[in-house]
Amino acid sequence: MALAEDTPTLAPAQIRRTATVTVGLLMGVWVIDYVDRVMMAVALPFIGQDFALTKTEQGWLITAFSLVYLLCQIPGGILADRFGARRQLMVSLLLWSVFTALTGIAWGLASLLVIRALFGVGQGLFPGASFKAVAERTTPGVRATAAGAMLASNQLGAGVAPLIVAPLILVLGWRHTFWVTAAAGVAIGVLLWKLLPKALPAHLNGSDVVEDKGLGLGAVMRSPSVWKFAALFCATNMLGYGLITWVPSYLLEERGISLINTGVMSAIPGLVMCATVFLGGWLFDRFFHDRARLYVIPLLLITAVLLVLMLMAESAVGFTVYQTLAMGVAGLSSMGILGMPVRALPPAVIGSGMGIVNVGGQIAGVLAPVLMGFLVDRFSYSAAFGLLIATTVLGALIALIVPQRPEQFSLGTKELA
């Protein structure tokens, strides 16, 4: 079908600029997102001491956020598809900045649980809107690379958070530190509102596909492909949530590392993973977009082996080296897991589709902190980290049944062979 005469056209340079500015801005927001999220793990020993919390209770502070964050994924994706990305990005950022600030005035376990749950509402509206914004402002051929760059900033935020938060806690205390990061969220929100480009025309970003095929939310919800990737993301995301939550406490309590050195040692794996997630997005787009299993399964098995070596390390340095290698290899696999739905879902329903996939990842966010806290209380840190080895191997097994190519990714009730 020929394009209408009034169909807008853009030069390649304009298309590239739209994608670059969009990804750059969203990377900044994701960094703040993860700093605000990870700082709770760094502050946990001090919050636990102030309020006399057990390890299980500390784990519930992370899980309260993660549970609400999970519940907001599908509604957040639906709202983004219905009302557009820009407005929802701003509402999300404003809400989570407010509740980050309110964390600093909490007076006990109950108030912390409520505030962190409401913080989860704010952050839970963000992922679907961010994927929607990327899909509207990129062409399908570069979408996994763009999404990989955006998601690499998760690990950048997770990496820099201990470097920023640990000194601030020492100088200002944990309460004032939450106020400082809340102010940073407001600042990046102003930049996002002023600088986010308009969406590309539908014939460039592919948002006319759903209209042509009559597909919508119902087809996404019934898609076995979407739910299989949600299960895969659940298994593999246990690693990130588990290590981010409990490694700082492990280094402080079991290895006797100072807070500043704990911050540095906790940052290194996240920064390496930031680079490998970005590289993984490029590798997937360039070489593996039609052979996802061949890419993901070996990487997950290598990750599991490195986690075993991490668990056996005799020194804190050895532990950090193997943790860094494990998270680096896991980072390479990330866009093999998320890149397929990012490439295959039409922009008009990508918010809903990625919301469902992200539900799987956030189930891991609910389970990992509290299960590992329970294992530490009842057994040891070794038992807790052993759980992550098992879930990583489980991810490799689930990868055997997910679609390998975009044309196998069905929005109907059956997958193509």
Model-derived features with residue positions:
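Cytoplasmic membrane-interface "Motif A"-like loop-to-helix N-cap segments
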Residues: 82-93, 285-300
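Helix-to-loop junctions at the C-terminal end of transmembrane segments
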Residues: 73-84, 277-289, 376
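Helix-loop-helix hairpin linking two adjacent transmembrane segments in secondary transporters
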Residues: 150-197
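Juxtamembrane intracellular "pre-TM" segments in multi-pass secondary transporters
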Residues: 7-15, 199-229
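Extracytoplasmic gate region of multi-pass secondary transporters
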Residues: 40-41, 224-278, 334, 338
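Conserved MFS/SLC helix-loop-helix module at the cytosolic interface between two early adjacent transmembrane helices
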Residues: 71-107
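C-terminal transmembrane helical hairpin of 12-TM major facilitator-type secondary transporters
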Residues: 290-337
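Cytoplasmic helix-loop-helix junction between adjacent transmembrane helices
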Residues: 115-154
